[in-house]
């Protein structure tokens, strides 16, 4: 008969997510787990949409080196046409080279460029079909997001979305 110790040899990699921790701490933990497989993901950030004011607001982030370009920022969604396009398509946006936005006039575009980010994968967040915000995976590298990598990042993205929804419904 198998010993009890033999039955409990695996430690759940994501067990910390069950703990009573603030969302920012959970996001930072999960970001480190993601970086074990995808070390090029330098920043994970969440911006929430306030339907009443039509504003997009920074909610939380995890940034390697803790030097986020956008920590407390809000802007009308109408001032971000490329983000509005994501909502219209109801699909993530992949930008393998952020230089396409190098002539952007918006503050958030300038801040991201100033920190040296080269690529971005942006997922729209939905709760029961209603748009609630965006999840950004940023990298200091160009072209790091291969299709097989995106499949795995999507899983993390949906996990983060559920964490955000859980946090919002608890408030």
Residues covered by each model-derived region:
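Regulatory loop-to-helix N-cap segments in sensory/regulatory domains
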Residues: 2, 138-155, 163-171
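Signal-transmission linkers at sensory-effector interfaces
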Residues: 1-25, 166-171
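Signal-transducing coupling segments at domain and membrane junctions
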Residues: 96-119, 139
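Short hydrophobic/glycine-rich mini-motifs in sensory/regulatory modules
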Residues: 125-135
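GAF sensory/regulatory domain recognition
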Residues: 45-71
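Regulatory sensory and allosteric helical modules in signal-transduction proteins
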Residues: 67-103
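Short, hydrophobic-rich beta-strand element in sensory/regulatory alpha-beta domains
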Residues: 29-35, 41-50, 56, 83
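A short, aliphatic-rich beta-strand micro-motif
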Residues: 118-126
